[in-house]
């Protein structure tokens, strides 16, 4: 940050701070927590604001997209953290939702739950950025056309909710081409994952079309 400061228009100041059931405050154990206690987050944002007076300063978190017990608890803990930071006057501007979608969890995706969470975050005066969008496949042994359709449908369902909320200001995919997707080594099972807009030869897939339609609709209705 000392080098780039406000050249970057947003900063991920604190990444993935929440982990349920470990520490009493719901924070993830880390060297920062060990050194400074739970207020390390406050200190991080205050220092970041001094280095970047006009940039957007964000918390970034994963695993908060589905109606599953562990994700429901994580959303609640995250919302409590955001409320606490706002009450303390901490210079936080928003929340990054990583949105690493998982086709194995699609039966547990509830539009209303995501919409309510976005409303709760927005009501705190915070922005939301979809920061790491991609899709983990459940069954890469299916025909490619079926796989691509499932990925596109999952992204479409998610963006229909996210982009309808005024707090959501941007969407960033966690890569462009399947060739370089982290999910190709972390996938389930291992192998080339088709969860990004372009295939391994950089040809657009149905997910790219869904993104184009979603953004075009957003701008047309602005």
Task: Identify the function of each model-found stretch.
Residues 75, 80-82, 113, 156:
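Sparse, context-dependent recognition of short Cys/His-centered cofactor- or disulfide-binding micro-motifs
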């Amino acid at each position: 940050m000392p080098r780039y400061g406000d050249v970057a228009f947003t900063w991920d100041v604190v990444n993935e701070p929440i982990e349920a059931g470990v520490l009493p405050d719901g924070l993830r154990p880390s060297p920062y927590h060990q050194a400074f206690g739970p207020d390390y987050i406050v200190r991080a944002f205050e220092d970041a604001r001094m280095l970047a007076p006009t940039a957007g300063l964000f918390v970034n978190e994963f695993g908060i997209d589905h109606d599953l017990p562990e994700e429901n608890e994580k959303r609640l803990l995250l919302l409590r953290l955001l409320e606490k930071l706002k009450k303390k006057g901490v210079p936080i501007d928003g929340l990054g939702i990583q949105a690493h979608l998982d086709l194995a969890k699609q039966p547990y995706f509830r539009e209303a739950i995501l919409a309510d969470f976005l409303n709760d975050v927005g009501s705190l005066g915070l922005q939301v950025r979809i920061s790491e969008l991609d899709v983990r496949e459940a069954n890469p042994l299916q025909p490619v056309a079926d796989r691509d359709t499932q990925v596109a449908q999952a992204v479409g369902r998610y963006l229909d909710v996210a982009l309808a909320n005024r707090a959501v200001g941007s969407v960033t995919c966690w890569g462009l081409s399947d060739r370089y997707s982290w999910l190709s080594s972390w996938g389930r099972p291992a192998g080339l994952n088709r969860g990004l807009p372009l295939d391994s030869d950089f040809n657009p897939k149905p997910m790219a079309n869904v993104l184009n339609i979603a953004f075009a609709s957003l701008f047309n209705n602005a």
